[in-house]
Amino acid sequence: MKKKSIKDKEQENNWEEKVVQVKRVTKVVKGGKKLSFRAILIVGNEKGEIGVGIGKASDVIGAVKKGVTDAKKHIINVPLTKSYSIPHPIEGISGAAKVILRPSAIGSGVIAGGSTRTVLELAGVKNILAKQLRSSNTLNNARAVLNALSQLRTFQNTAQNRDINIERLFNM
């Protein structure tokens, strides 16, 4: 049986990539300043899989390519409800950035700003309320959302952790 390559997996999952930020950064060396680019990318398949990555290179295209490979290395699965929302409210922290995510009613849409909105849309979340607190840093806010989404638990996970069946969980 043939082993699946990375390109086969890419075509299978239909990954969508979005560049959130491209920044010119400099490094001071003996001969002067060395210029390079840093790209922050978000990769998702809109079916509950999402990843955030960073790429640095001397040109923008190289930085974007490195960012895509980095994002695909850090992919997490997000449990979504039937209404394409999250199962319960949650908070995520990365650095100084704090993000609060709350499930929302059908038809309310993605109410979020900046990189938080991009992460949630590429994850496949369609109804959610989000608020960024304490920091406006693009990278830390994206990572805070990823941190929050990775902490989400379904009813089945909770029931298994407590060693009870789902019906008993609802009767409590």
Swiss-Prot record:
It is found in: Plastid, Chloroplast. The keyword RNA-binding applies. Keywords: Chloroplast, Plastid, Ribonucleoprotein, Ribosomal protein, RNA-binding, rRNA-binding. Gene3D superfamilies: 3.30.160.20, 3.30.230.10. Residues 15-78 form the S5 DRBM domain. InterPro entries: Ribosomal_Su5_D2-typ_SF (IPR020568), Ribosomal_uS5 (IPR000851), Ribosomal_uS5_bac-type (IPR005712), Ribosomal_uS5_C (IPR005324), Ribosomal_uS5_N (IPR013810), Ribosomal_uS5_N_CS (IPR018192), Ribsml_uS5_D2-typ_fold_subgr (IPR014721). GO terms for biological process: translation. The keyword Transferase does not apply. One of its GO terms (cellular component) is chloroplast. One of its GO terms (molecular function) is rRNA binding. Belongs to the universal ribosomal protein uS5 family. The N-terminal domain interacts with the head of the 30S subunit; the C-terminal domain interacts with the body and contacts protein S4. The interaction surface between S4 and S5 is involved in control of translational fidelity. With S4 and S12 plays an important role in translational accuracy. Part of the 30S ribosomal subunit. Contacts protein S4. This is Small ribosomal subunit protein uS5c. It comes from Gracilaria tenuistipitata var. liui (Red alga).
